[in-house]
Amino acid sequence: MNPLIAASSVIAAGLAIGLAAIGPGVGQGTVAGNAVEGIARQPEAEGKIRGTLLLSFAFMESLTIYGLVVALALLFANPFVGA
């Protein structure tokens, strides 16, 4: 295995998971804060807000999981390594 390809793959895997976690992390914090504000303003809508909140958390977390899959593929099933 070419050392340059190996080093580039490790750096790319680290960037993939790191950058894939930043966006959803910021988004989840923002959404949770807005949900708390919404529940404080309208306590009777708590169930509807909570359901929407959990669904949006699942969509945001899927982006992080996709980044993890890309990182694992770069580390263990690297398509750039010659056979």
Swiss-Prot record:
Disulfide bonds: none annotated. It comes from the Eukaryota. Keywords: ATP synthesis, CF(0), Chloroplast, Hydrogen ion transport, Ion transport, Lipid-binding, Membrane, Plastid, Thylakoid, Transmembrane, Transmembrane helix, Transport. The record marks 61 as: Reversibly protonated during proton transport. InterPro entries: ATP_synth_csu_bac/chlpt, ATP_synth_F0_csu, ATP_synth_F0_csu_DDCD_BS, ATP_synth_F0_csu_sf, ATPase_proteolipid_c-like_dom, F/V-ATP_Csub_sf. It is found in: Plastid, Chloroplast thylakoid membrane. GO terms for cellular component: chloroplast thylakoid membrane; proton-transporting ATP synthase complex; proton-transporting two-sector ATPase complex, proton-transporting domain. Pfam families: ATP-synt_C. GO terms for molecular function: lipid binding; proton-transporting ATP synthase activity, rotational mechanism. It is a multi-pass membrane protein. The keyword tRNA-binding does not apply. The keyword Cell wall biogenesis/degradation does not apply. In plastids the F-type ATPase is also known as CF(1)CF(0). F(1)F(0) ATP synthase produces ATP from ADP in the presence of a proton or sodium gradient. F-type ATPases consist of two structural domains, F(1) containing the extramembraneous catalytic core and F(0) containing the membrane proton channel, linked together by a central stalk and a peripheral stalk. During catalysis, ATP synthesis in the catalytic domain of F(1) is coupled via a rotary mechanism of the central stalk subunits to proton translocation. F-type ATPases have 2 components, F(1) - the catalytic core - and F(0) - the membrane proton channel. F(1) has five subunits: alpha(3), beta(3), gamma(1), delta(1), epsilon(1). F(0) has four main subunits: a(1), b(1), b'(1) and c(10-14). The alpha and beta chains form an alternating ring which encloses part of the gamma chain. F(1) is attached to F(0) by a central stalk formed by the gamma and epsilon chains, while a peripheral stalk is formed by the delta, b and b' chains. This is ATP synthase subunit c, chloroplastic. It comes from Oedogonium cardiacum. The lineage of its organism: Eukaryota, Viridiplantae, Chlorophyta, core chlorophytes, Chlorophyceae.
